[in-house]
Structures are given as C-alpha cells and as structure tokens.
Amino acid sequence: VGGPHCLMKDIKYAGVLFESLATHELTVYAKANDATVFHYNDSYGLEVDAIVQKRNGNYAAFEIKLGVGYIEEAAENLKKFQRNIDTSKMNLPKSLNIITGTGVSHRRPDGINVISISSLGQ
C-alpha cells in the first residue's frame, strides 16, 4: 500500500514530511540548548520555515528543503527575510541556514550555511 516508492511519486508530500522531520530535530536540539523554535510568516507573505531563538534573544533562521535543487530559492528567501528586518527594533539573525536532505554541509560564499540533515547535532 505504501512505502518509499509512493513518496517518490509525490515529491511535494515527501518535502512536507522532510520539513516536519527537520523541524522536530531542530526542536530537540533547541530544547537541549535552552532555545525555542518558531515559524515566521509576515503580512507580506514572506515565510521562514524555522527560527531558533535563545533566551538572550539571539536567533538563527532556517529554510528546510528536501532537494538541493531548491537551495538558491531558499537562499534568496533568507536574504529577503534579513533585508526586511528593522534593526532599530531587533537584531539581525546570527546565522542564515538551509537544511537539506542530501549533499555535503558547507558555507556558501554569501555566508549562508547549507546543512545536511545528517550533520545536525554534530
């Protein structure tokens, strides 16, 4: 009835499941580090999959993408998020990050971290 082959037929649904898994993993690591995970969505339709904020107010922004083919789109979204921050009211994020299902973790030339989900917690 089900199985991995069914998910490959519906890659959008697989992406939703991956986002849920990655958010769960971020939540586990956040709690262990006295931080909280939020979802960001503003009145202009800009969305960021996860914001991890420490008690002191420092935070990091995360986009979660199953496939590496969505990295550029995710990076542009994170940059737009950062550009829209009113720094008279809040600080910029300490880091911008993209969690992916595959690939090697690395820092892009623009400073955005691309993190393979298998690297979380290491």
What are these regions (language model features)?
Residues 1-122:
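A cross-kingdom feature that marks ATP-driven nucleic-acid transaction machinery
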